[in-house]
Amino acid sequence: GHDPVDGLWSYWPAKESIADLLALREAHPYTFLSQYMQAPNKLDGGIFTEGGFLYFGDEDGGADLPLPRKWEYRFITADTAQKTNTWNDWTVFAEWGVFEGRIYRLNYQRARMEAPQLRRDFTSFVNACWEKNSGLAGNLRAVLVEDKVSGTGLIQEVQGKLPLRITPVPRERDKLTRALDAQGHQAAGKVVLPLDDPQNFEFVAEVASFTADDSHRFDDQTDVMIDAIDYAIIKPATAADKTKVTW
């Protein structure tokens, strides 16, 4: 714990070894920069706002909204990384519940993983969400996976092991355009996070740090949120507009 690693060392090795600190930097970069380096990332990428999120749970404990009694339906968005190097994006699976025009983030998994683990974890994640199907939990309606190299491979390899078909999400538009489409909905409190979830800090920090010039470090969590907004809020509204009768 006292020996430097890659030229770095801990000021308090008896309390926190350099190995522990490097592990924290890897797993929770925003937390590490804020608490240990006294150099928090600027949470203002100019697109999404930290204050745009609402929180659900115990209202007496500070939540903005209660846990809905019944979900209208649920769905999953997934963003897969092609490599597990520390400088590459993460793989993220997110389950969402829909209620009165808002999306609530439910189960959530974020990790760097090789292909075999990706297949196992994704299959387990989807099946666990499917098994909750009931009147109050609502039905799992869709599984959306980004249609790129790693995502396409995942779709082909696990489709037969899942209880419903995967919906590939093509990347027909650039990331900034998709972010700008979702921006107003996030700012309007349409994305609701579970109160006291320890994963919230990294999630909010990453989304709020998303930049127009692609200078942000990661955007895998932002991607799954954008896909969720597009699927459950933007597309239904667009479809409703198209069915309106004009005179």
What annotation goes with each model-predicted range?
Residues P4, S10, L106-Q109, E114-P116, ...:
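Conserved inter-motif catalytic segment of the P-loop NTP-binding fold
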Residues H2-T80:
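ATPase catalytic-site recognition across NTP-hydrolyzing enzymes
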Residues A78, V145-K148:
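Short His-Asn-centered micro-motif
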Residues L67-V98, V224:
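Gly/Thr-rich phosphate-binding beta-strand-loop-beta motif of the actin/hexokinase/Hsp70
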Residues A81-K83, V98-G101, R110-A111, S150, ...:
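Short, glycine-/Ser/Thr-/acidic-enriched flexible segments
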